[in-house]
């Protein structure tokens, strides 16, 4: 661990969106960063910004988390110890499961699930030895509600279930874990996935700062499942209380459940 100096947070996917929001918020709280994504130019620009605005130092790891080598490089860095890990990199796709490119589906599973598993496994031993550390795994409300897309929702359900199970196992170790479950957030996500969001009502949109602020406050409060926004807290609660076949129908009708993987 790095307690003698500034604490260090490793964030996957900070080249845009929620990950960039975590990087700015944590740099503002005094962390140095390890920035992990494919777009080196974006990571270098962020590192410069974090240095100028907050005096934070950043290591840049420009790797593809869909590859074995990419994940191995991050695992090796985590084994040397970090104070916080934010498993945020992830993506969705459009089209139906049965016509989607199998290679793309596999890389989605590798980024959204395998990387979360391997990076968490790599970070924990040093944290447990130190008796402290934080891991935020970015899931989605899509992982809480049935009937909204297939592989993306399944990947996020894995992240929720994995993180909640892990929280039980880590009780008493001093290490905190959180499954962050945002609804729609204004980032590059939907454009990259090719998802048309033009008919999504304003009330369903969250902004990155709100999501990051809620996550960090919930971490301090010891909440394992963090759901930013009152509208999504209500939806998630309703999703547990209403019969699941009705939830499936509603999410397919109002959530445009077809054409998603
Ligand atoms: N936006 C939403 O409505 C929403 C809602 C719920 C949950 N989420 C989740 O929030 C997380 C962040 O998404 P976002 O909304 O901030 O989207 P975004 O702006 O598209 O950012 C995604 C990040 O993931 C990184 N990434 C994607 N594939 C990668 C790969 N193969 N290797 C390494 N990094 C990779 C991207 O970096 P590079 O392209 O540089 O590699 C980028 O930094 C995701 O896990 C997403 O599922 C988003």
Where do the protein language model's features map onto the residues?
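Active-site helix of classical SDR
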Residues: 120, 155
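Conserved NAD(P)H cofactor-binding loop of Rossmann-fold oxidoreductase domains
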Residues: 88-93
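Substrate-binding pocket helix/loop in short-chain dehydrogenase/reductase
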Residues: 96-107
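C-terminal helical subdomain
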Residues: 179, 199-235
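Residue(s) in the substrate-gating loop at a strand-loop-helix junction
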Residues: 140
């Amino acid at each position: 661990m790095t307690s003698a100096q500034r604490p260090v947070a490793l964030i996957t996917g900070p080249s845009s969106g929620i990950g960039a929001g975590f990087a700015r918020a944590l740099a503002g709280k005094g962390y140095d960063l390890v920035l992990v994504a494919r777009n080196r130019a974006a990571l270098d620009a962020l590192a410069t910004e974090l240095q100028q605005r907050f005096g934070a130092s950043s290591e840049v790891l420009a790797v593809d988390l869909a590859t074995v080598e990419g994940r191995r490089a991050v695992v090796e860095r985590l084994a040397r110890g970090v104070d916080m890990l934010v498993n945020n990199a992830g993506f969705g796709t459009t089209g139906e499961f049965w016509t989607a490119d199998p290679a793309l589906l596999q890389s989605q599973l590798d980024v959204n699930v395998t990387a979360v598993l391997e990076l968490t496994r790599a970070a924990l031993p040093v944290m447990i030895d130190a008796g402290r550390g934080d891991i935020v795994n970015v899931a989605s409300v899509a992982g809480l509600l049935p009937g909204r897309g297939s592989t993306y929702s399944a990947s996020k359900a894995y992240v929720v279930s994995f993180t909640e199970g892990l929280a039980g196992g880590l009780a008493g170790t001093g290490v905190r874990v959180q499954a962050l479950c945002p609804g729609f957030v204004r980032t590059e996500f939907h454009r990259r996935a090719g998802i048309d969001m033009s008919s999504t009502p304003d009330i369903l949109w969250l902004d990155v700062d709100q999501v990051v602020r809620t996550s960090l406050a919930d971490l301090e409060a010891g909440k394992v499942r963090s759901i930013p926004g009152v509208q999504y807290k209500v939806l998630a609660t309703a999703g547990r209380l209403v019969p699941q076949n009705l939830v499936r129908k509603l999410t397919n009708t109002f959530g445009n459940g077809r054409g998603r993987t």
